[in-house]
């Protein structure tokens, strides 16, 4: 049995969940991703079963290389979420394979990442269908909505993170997601806001401050 995923992180998670060794697809095929696609000589994979996780992240070029290495008689299981963001590279391989109707597939409907009665599940399903529930802005036990201008976001994050810390939580218990790197509401600035709260600079610690430019 061979296990692989598009990224190192996904491969590590796959290995942890199965208790079996897993690798990136590139490593499985013995390539580094910098070769000339037309000149790559892919050797046939050994084994009887190949499982590829996070298939939605696989682009057309990588899938082509993978197919070159699959020998006749090897069974292949592709695992993924067609509704996740598509691959960075060209193509929507996993989505198109399912839409083609040429493959047998099973769709898992039970969500284990959210507790029973979670409103996030219903909200995500509605947004995926292009709808916005009327109670989107109404505070729920497991989610809240705070309207804010771009310049107001850092202060809002500061208040939320400070409150979170005061309740005894650490930075490892919190995730901040942003759709971009720059702007006041971007990743770079919000990381600085979070660092000032959870790991501020202090004369009591030996630290090095590095600035780019």
Regions of interest found by a model, annotated:
Residues 1-137:
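ASCE P-loop NTPase helicase motor core
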Residues 72, 212-213:
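Short, flexible surface segments
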Residues 82-212:
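Conserved helicase motor core of P-loop NTPases
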């Amino acid at each position: 049995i061979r296990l692989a995923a598009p990224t190192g992180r996904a491969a590590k998670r796959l290995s942890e969940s199965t208790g079996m060794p897993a690798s990136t697809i590139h490593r499985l095929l013995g390539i580094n991703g910098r070769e000339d696609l037309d000149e790559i000589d892919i050797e046939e994979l050994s084994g009887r079963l190949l499982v590829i996780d996070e298939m939605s992240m696989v682009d057309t070029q990588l899938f082509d290389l993978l197919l070159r290495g699959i020998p006749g008689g090897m069974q292949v299981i592709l695992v993924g979420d067609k509704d996740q963001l598509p691959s960075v590279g060209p193509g929507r391989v996993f989505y198109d394979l399912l839409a083609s109707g040429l493959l047998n597939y099973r769709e898992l409907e039970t969500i284990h990442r959210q507790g029973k009665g979670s409103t996030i599940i219903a909200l995500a399903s509605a947004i995926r269908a292009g709808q916005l529930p009327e109670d989107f802005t109404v505070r729920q036990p497991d989610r809240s909505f705070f309207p804010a201008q771009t310049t107001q976001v850092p202060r809002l994050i500061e208040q939320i993170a400070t409150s979170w810390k005061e309740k005894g939580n650490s930075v490892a218990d919190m995730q901040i997601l942003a759709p971009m790197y720059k702007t006041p509401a971007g990743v770079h600035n919000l990381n600085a806001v979070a660092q000032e709260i959870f790991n501020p600079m202090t004369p009591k610690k030996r630290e090095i401050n590095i600035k780019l430019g």
